[in-house]
Curated annotation (Swiss-Prot):
Proprotein convertase involved in the processing of hormone and other protein precursors at sites comprised of pairs of basic amino acid residues. In males, important for ADAM2 processing as well as other acrosomal proteins with roles in fertilization and critical for normal fertilization events such as sperm capacitation, acrosome reaction and binding of sperm to zona pellucida. Also plays a role in female fertility, involved in the regulation of trophoblast migration and placental development, may be through the proteolytical processing and activation of proteins such as IGF2. This is Proprotein convertase subtilisin/kexin type 4. The lineage of its organism: Eukaryota, Metazoa, Chordata, Craniata, Vertebrata. Residues 449-581 form the P/Homo B domain. The chain crosses the membrane at residues 709-729.
Length: 755
């Protein structure tokens, strides 16, 4: 006799319930355990609580807070631990008109946040994490706060990822992965005798190698989801780069890239039109408008005296450029010095230096990963920890945090200088060694940055001979009095068109009104080009938080052959920053989850301790960009007095950056390139997000309910996974890329920034 269909379904459900959650990628869910105590809020204080306790058999254990509104009750007739609440006492309390709120208490799982050292056999070799090096990257300090990258998705754009690797498989995320070399969903690397396609797997392990599994080492964000994009193992075009950088922008939080143009000391090259558009769309629309985080290795051309300001990827304002240092704090032989580098993590130098431990091809491990290729993924993992601590950080917030969490420490260089706001900065190291503990601490208390402003100053538009040494000075108001006026700088660009008889002999510098001198490009002896720079954009981060008003000085100096000649045709100074004085901002706490005093069954906050706004699981001092604060009335049940109104953060309309309400006419500021209509209160411009509803990646594999996730996943397989589960590449861009793919493009060869 065949079992009835219902019985089959029940067996299936039971079987799924017995499957180990880790085996199918689900987070374990613990049922609440109810205890024999209650918290109650009454309107008439201790006298009413005593009457209530006598009537229903409770013991009054006294007030919870000194003001006498909340009380702790216990009932001796209720079992100490139960999987179900006591419905009888619940009904008694609910019917009592003097009880404003009550909650039967449940056991809370808490652990002491001492430093838990991973048991992975090669963790002892991870000197940059295990406190063997001093200073290390303070990874243990971040872990001791309970942070591990949970809920954060990182994708490594490289030559593929060994998705079945013993140290990666459990964290592998297929939605954050794709093969753009062969156009299929499988990013598995192509195996060769020389193991040339090991790069992506090595970088992925640095970010999210599993912890405590008895294998290899551990990743910085060992509970983050990790994906890989195979895009370097074949002919690379502008289309492939743009598609890789646009993969799942509402699902992937961080893209890590350790590649770029050739580090040969003579190349000046950068992203094409489509890739620049992908960067722009990523920071304006990615992560729900908070902005995708692009982490980039600064380059390995030090042996050829290369300069990463001649690399248009690492000197983009949209990427966070990471340099390298050795265990001893020395400049590695391959390191490039340039003004666009923001921060530094560890790698190695000479062959005898300890290197980086990570995953390797053929399910192996290696302790010989090096180059800036090794530094950028370490930074990506640390940034994943910061994003877990505060998921509402924008892409610019994160760059501000990295500036503040990077310190000179023991890093050795002759060019350390103090900029106009008192920070030390170097062309080799940016603002110094990134400290994960300081990064997450600062992230928790960070006040959202005001909208980005851009002020363009056309300084030179007529041909000017370049003498052996010339200075071009311009008194800049930083657009004072206009809607785009800037008080505190972030990125500064100098866009130059010039000719020169031997390009590599020309040193270009920029000095701010506050006296900070930044070398935009130093001499490059191997660059013998006579082409000069055609509309090339140099970028410096050395003026961060300075006031831009005053005289800016561009210096051009011949450092080589005496008879070199050239002409400067155009020079535009591009200032990016904010209207806020960042040096004067308060240091009070902004984000905290411990301030939540009441949660629902799903962990969402229902009440905060003190004047704060509720946003999901957090209590905020004020709402981040894309949200507005308001009060929401709470309907009281029959016989209950009205509960106080909740202070909450609600979503702005998609077209707004900041707002005073949820309507498209409630905007108070706009995303970059959009214009605010002051009278209408609306944003108009090309970057206004499309209002069409989109399927989100979160709707499938990371659904809050595992059963729902499985149903949606089965439907996705049946009906076409990418369509249902949120292959959320922006549709206009996807159509644009599809058309561009049919257009022949000149093949380009990019080299990984390490081995």
């Amino acid at each position: 006799m065949r079992p009835a269909p219902i019985a089959l379904w029940l067996r299936l459900v039971l079987a799924l319930a017995l499957v180990r959650p880790r085996a199918v990628g689900w987070a374990p869910v613990r049922a609440p355990i109810y205890v024999s105590s209650w918290a109650v809020q009454v309107s008439q204080g201790n006298r009413e609580v005593e009457r209530l306790a006598r009537k229903f058999g409770f013991v009054n254990l006294g007030p919870i807070f000194p003001d006498g509104q909340y009380f702790h009750l216990r009932h001796r007739g209720v079992v100490q631990q139960s999987l179900t609440p006591h419905w009888g006492h619940r009904l008694h309390l609910k019917k009592n008109p003097k009880v404003q709120w009550f909650q039967q208490q449940t056991l809370q799982r808490r652990v002491k946040r001492s430093v838990v050292v991973p048991t992975d056999p090669w963790f002892s070799k991870q000197w940059y994490m295990n406190s063997e090096a001093q200073p290390d990257l303070s990874i243990l300090q971040a872990w001791s706060q309970g942070l591990s990258g949970q809920g954060i998705v990182v994708s490594v754009l490289d030559d593929g990822i060994e998705k079945d690797h013993p140290d990666l498989w459990a964290n592998y995320d297929p939605l954050a992965s794709y093969d753009f070399n062969d156009y299929d969903p499988d990013p598995q690397p192509r195996y060769t005798p020389s193991k040339e396609n090991r790069h992506g797997t090595r970088c992925a392990g640095e970010v999210a190698a599993m912890a405590n599994n008895g294998f290899c080492g551990v990743g910085v964000a060992f509970n983050a989801r990790i994906g890989g994009v195979r895009m370097l193992d074949g002919t690379i075009t502008d289309v492939i780069e743009a598609q890789s950088l646009s993969l799942q922008p509402q699902h992937i939080h961080i893209y890590s890239a350790s590649w770029g143009p050739e580090d040969d000391g003579r190349t000046v090259d950068g992203p094409g039109i489509l890739t620049r558009e992908a960067f722009r769309r990523g920071v304006t629309k990615g992560r729900g408008g908070l902005g995708t985080l692009f982490i980039w290795a600064s380059g390995n051309g030090g042996l050829h005296y290369d300069n990463c300001n001649c690399d248009g990827y690492t000197n983009s304002i949209h990427t966070l450029s990471v340099g390298s240092t050795t265990q001893q704090g020395r400049v590695p032989w391959y390191s490039e010095a340039c003004a666009s580098t923001l921060t530094t993590t560890y790698s190695s130098g000479v062959a005898t230096d300890p290197q980086i431990v990570t995953t390797d091809l053929h399910h192996g491990c290696t302790d010989q990963h090096t180059g800036t290729s090794a530094s950028a993924p370490l930074a990506a993992g640390m940034i994943a920890l910061a994003l877990e601590a505060n998921p509402f950080l924008t892409w610019r917030d994160m760059q501000h945090l990295v500036v503040r969490a990077s310190k000179p420490a023991h890093l050795q260089a002759e060019d350390w200088r103090t900029n106009g706001v008192g920070r030390q900065v170097s062309h080799h190291y940016g603002y110094g060694l990134l400290d994960a503990g300081l990064l997450v601490d600062t992230a928790r208390t960070w006040l959202p940055t005001q909208p980005q402003r851009k002020c363009a100053v056309r300084v030179q538009s007529r041909p000017t001979p370049i003498l052996p040494l010339i200075y071009i000075r311009e008194n800049v108001s930083a657009c004072a009095g206009l809607h785009n006026s800037i008080r505190s700088l972030e990125h500064v660009q100098a866009q130059l068109t010039l000719s020169y008889s031997r390009r590599g002999d020309l040193e270009i510098s920029l000095t701010s009104p506050m006296g900070t001198r930044s070398t935009l490009v130093a001499i490059r002896p191997l660059d013998v080009s006579t082409e000069g720079y055609n509309n090339w954009v140099f970028m410096s981060t050395h003026f961060w938080d300075e006031n831009p008003q005053g005289v800016w000085t561009l210096g051009l100096e011949n450092k080589g052959y005496y008879f070199n000649t050239g002409t400067l045709y155009r020079y535009t100074l591009l200032l990016y920053g904010t209207a806020e004085d960042m040096t004067a901002r308060p240091t009070g706490p902004q984000v905290t989850s411990s301030a939540c005093v009441q949660r629902d069954t799903e962990g969402l906050c229902q009440a905060c301790d003190g004047p704060a706004y509720i946003l999901g699981q957090l209590c905020l001092a004020y709402c981040p960009p894309r949200f507005f604060n308001h009060t929401r009335l709470v309907t009281a049940g029959p016989g209950h007095t009205a509960a106080p109104a909740l202070r909450v953060c609600s979503s702005c309309h998609a077209s707004c950056y900041t707002c005073r309400g949820g309507s498209p006419r409630d905007c108070t500021s706009c995303p970059p390139s959009s214009t605010l209509d002051q009278q209408q209160g609306s944003c108009m411009g090309p970057t206004t997000p499309d209002s069409r509803p989109r399927l989100r990646a979160a709707a499938c594999p990371h659904h809050r309910c595992p059963a729902s996730a499985m149903v949606l996943s089965l439907l996705a397989v049946t009906l076409g996974g990418p369509v249902l589960c949120g292959m959320s590449m922006d549709l206009p861009l996807y159509a644009w890329l599809s058309r561009a793919r049919a257009t022949p493009t000149k093949p380009q060869v990019w080299l990984p920034a390490g081995t």
